[in-house]
Amino acid sequence: MRRDIQQVLERWGTWARDNNTGIDWSPIAAGFKGLLPLRPSMRPSCSDEDGRIIDNCVSQLQQVRQPEELSLIIAYYVKGYSKRAIARRRRVDEGLIRAKLLIAEGFIDGCLSLLAVRLDMDPEVKMYSPQKSGKRISAVRKKFVNVL
């Protein structure tokens, strides 16, 4: 089953932010967590079971000594920073941030594939291949050949 890993991670990020999984650090001081009201997000989230599975895959980034990629996943998907903002903060090119995020997303997608587990969100994040029509493809080929 092919999944859109970015949609999976967006849902996981919402779940992780709302449930504070502790994969990064707690935004609330010890002992004060129950005193603040929960702020549910309007973004789509994943189930607790899916969240724990994805959490384990994300935490594997730290196990294989890739803490920078883990921090990018946390910054982008959990905290909601844009790729440009992350690049500015780290004083690096945005293309480098994009490349490292792609590597981290691929790693997490690979972990999920190795587990061969079916997620509750699979029907919503399934990658659909576009229907191929011979006429359209041949028309594109003709235009491409004419350009050359």
Swiss-Prot record:
Classification via InterPro entries: Phage_933W_GpQ
Keyword Cytoplasm applies: no
Domain of life: Viruses
Signal peptide: none
Molecular function, one GO term: DNA binding
Keywords of the record: DNA-binding, Transcription, Transcription antitermination, Transcription regulation
Biological process according to GO: transcription antitermination
Role noted for this protein: Positively regulates expression of some phage genes. Bacterial host RNA polymerase modified by antitermination proteins transcribes through termination sites that otherwise prevent expression of the regulated genes.
Similarity remark: Belongs to the phage antitermination Q type 1 family.
Name the UniProt record assigns to this protein: Probable antitermination protein Q
Taxonomic source organism: Acyrthosiphon pisum secondary endosymbiont phage 1
